[in-house]
Amino acid sequence: MTLAEVLERIDRERPGESTEEEKLRWLSQVDGQWYREMVLTHEGAEETTFAPYTTDGDKSVALLIAPPYDEVYIHFLYMQIDQRLGEIDRYNNDAALYNQGMLEARQAYNREHMPLQGSRLRNIFPIYNPTRDSNNPLA
């Protein structure tokens, strides 16, 4: 899905409820998070770039989350609009759809892209040895 397709769909389905600047900021949040948490932590990151979307930027650019998971963009924008309008029930429905879509997109990305090997967690705390503890009466 391209940036222009998302903007056109939101304008058609929810006309006048948000400005283009707001929609671009929200889309930048989604793709920025995806880029940091998914793309940069997996092999092949050098093939993908991301810069926040602007009103004077190219609207034909493809968004980072590929089909069939790209509906997350629509649900995220609906979520933001509903939150601002105080439509809590609609917000909750859109949030559930967004979260489910992101979960499925992350799972698919993890299946298709190998995580970077240098990103393992390391134990930075020393191992406790009770025989070396001078305050331990059993030592």
Label for each model-derived stretch:
Residues 1-63, 107-139:
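Conserved short "hinge" loops at termini or chain/domain junctions
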Residues 18-22, 69, 90:
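Extracytoplasmic/periplasmic, Sec-exported soluble proteins
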Residues 62-71:
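Structural motif
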Residues 71-83:
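Short, hydrophobic/amphipathic alpha-helical patches that form generic packing surfaces
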Residues 81-91:
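Short helix-capping/linker segments at secondary-structure and domain boundaries
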Residues 92-106:
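Short secondary-structure subsegments characteristic of cysteine-rich extracellular domains
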